[in-house]
């Protein structure tokens, strides 16, 4: 290899046969507001392994396990191995969404990073809303994102969408006539429609009227972001997280740390569990509710949604035990999901 070729290889972040898709995945993550430094580091290690050990065809269970063995070196912590495996899994889900590769692995066990999503009670949800509603802007000239937080928190809880999806919504994606929001920037790269109820629609319309008074002409354009800071710029997820933690503090809900939560993503988990309880309360068979919830959350398959059944049993055991836990299908799902990987941001 010539010196020029070596220099070219060193300048490229990814060099394997999946380099183009890795670049696209990183761009997609950044577009959703995620910090990618750690993920890029993990992906480069995966890329080097693939470059040195090209798969014979697609990436399957056997190939993945070979890679996993290569990172399970004595000096590697279980947390580090889990982080790399999570990145690989996210990338493989991206490939599946593109129709490139079908295999999606389960994550390894990680004692250092175990957590169960925090499910807020209905009272805690109302306390969070009241806390963010009562938070005042400290300076008239502040570039704060606070003006969007009350509607964002309600949007996440009402629709169950991911925060990355919410901050990517454009004005043109909101259809008040049909009471829906179109999600173009889905995590799984699948377009989906989120229904909005009457109360959320009223909140959104009130926010838009206030937002359109900002001294910027672009804020109301169809392709401009729906949720903005006072300068008319789109929201940063890290800023959203900070406002959420502040709301937890004001609501008297202890923040126990990043992996212990509660996190902004737990509004999505809570939305699903509360929706499941509502469907059961309205008489829907619990087993039949899973496909409905899968569509609601934008999951590619029902497997990810099944884990909410176990979580609902843990949080609301009386309700679940009273209805359908006696059914063999429900028992099988609860037992299966209790033995699988830990919760992750994929959900």
Predicted features and spans:
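Conserved catalytic core of the tyrosine transesterase superfamily
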Residues: 2-347
């Amino acid at each position: 290899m010539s010196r020029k070729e070596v220099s070219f290889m060193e300048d490229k972040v990814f060099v394997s046969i999946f380099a183009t898709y890795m670049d696209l995945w990183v761009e997609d993550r950044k577009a959703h507001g995620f910090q990618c430094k750690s993920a890029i580091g993990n992906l480069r290690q995966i890329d080097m392994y693939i470059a040195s050990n090209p798969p014979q065809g697609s990436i399957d269970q056997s190939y993945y396990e070979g890679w996993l063995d290569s990172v399970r070196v004595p000096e590697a912590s279980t947390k580090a191995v889990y982080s790399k495996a999570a990145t690989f899994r996210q990338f493989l889900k991206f490939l599946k969404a593109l129709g490139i590769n079908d295999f999606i692995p389960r994550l390894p066990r990680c004692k250092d990073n175990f957590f169960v999503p925090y499910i807020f009670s209905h009272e805690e949800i109302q306390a969070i809303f009241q806390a963010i509603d009562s938070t005042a802007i400290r300076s008239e000239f502040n570039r704060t994102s606070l003006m969007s937080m009350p509607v964002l928190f309600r949007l996440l809880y009402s629709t169950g969408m991911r925060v990355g999806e919410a901050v990517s919504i454009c004005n043109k994606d909101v259809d008040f006539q049909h009471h829906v929001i179109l999600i173009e920037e889905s995590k799984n790269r699948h377009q989906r429609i989120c229904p909005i109820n009457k109360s959320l629609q009223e909140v959104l319309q009130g926010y838009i009227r206030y937002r359109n008074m900002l001294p910027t002409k672009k804020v109301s354009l169809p392709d401009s972001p729906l949720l903005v800071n006072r300068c008319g710029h789109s929201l940063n997820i890290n800023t959203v997280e900070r406002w959420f933690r502040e709301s937890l503090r004001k609501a008297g809900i202890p923040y126990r740390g990043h992996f212990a939560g509660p996190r902004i993503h737990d509004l999505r988990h809570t939305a699903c569990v509360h929706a499941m309880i509502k469907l059961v309360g309205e008489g829907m068979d619990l087993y039949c509710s899973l496909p409905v919830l899968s569509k609601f959350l934008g999951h590619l398959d029902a497997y990810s949604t099944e884990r909410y059944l176990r979580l609902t049993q843990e949080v609301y055991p009386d309700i679940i035990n009273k209805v359908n836990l006696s059914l063999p299908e429900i028992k099988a799902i609860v037992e299966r999901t209790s033995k699988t990987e830990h919760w992750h941001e994929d959900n």
